[in-house]
């Protein structure tokens, strides 16, 4: 599986050119993209500026010598490459399995070309088998949990290996919703954002331009149909 992820990540790095501002994604597939950017800077003299989507990616990028800027210090991002946990035929997706969904969405928003890199197991007919992460402020989180429960969304607080509640880079909690199937991702996204205490959700609807899918037969590109 790592070989497929590496294939997708390295392929995506081919979209990066000199002088670009590049969004650096988080997760096991985006990791290989960031590594390849680091290699190209070192071996080819590639000149780019990175904008990271998590403290984890910041640490990786700094270790590779990738120059970084805050999302607040740039006008726009030329290309962002990130992973996804599920992608449907309309290229809506679920992200946030690594807990970085808020920063990932903040970086995706000013991005001109937004690309996901996945292995073929992430392409699904309908979203929802993967639990949907919802980032919530700590204050009142238990009330939100009960609200989700009353809606039949089967919530669970994300926890660390030690059993403590997982805290995001932005110091929020994550409640994962076990929905099974999501019939209308856009309506659900709107509903969640309207709930007081919800900071962000892991539905990325209509945001991505292309998805690089690595499978046993190589790499294919799936693009949004006009």
From Swiss-Prot:
Keywords from the UniProt entry: Isomerase
One function term, GO molecular function aspect: ribose-5-phosphate isomerase activity
Catalytic activities: aldehydo-D-ribose 5-phosphate = D-ribulose 5-phosphate
Pathway of action: Carbohydrate degradation; pentose phosphate pathway; D-ribose 5-phosphate from D-ribulose 5-phosphate (non-oxidative stage): step 1/1
EC code(s) of this entry: 5.3.1.6
Enzyme kind, highest EC tier: isomerase
GO biological process, one term: pentose-phosphate shunt, non-oxidative branch
Active site: 104
CDD domains: RPI_A
InterPro entries, per the entry: NagB/RpiA_transferase-like, Ribose-5P_isomerase, Ribose5P_isomerase_typA_subgr, Ribose5P_isomerase_type_A
Function: Catalyzes the reversible conversion of ribose-5-phosphate to ribulose 5-phosphate.
HAMAP family according to UniProt: Rib_5P_isom_A
Assembly, per entry: Homodimer.
Family: Belongs to the ribose 5-phosphate isomerase family.
Protein name: Ribose-5-phosphate isomerase A
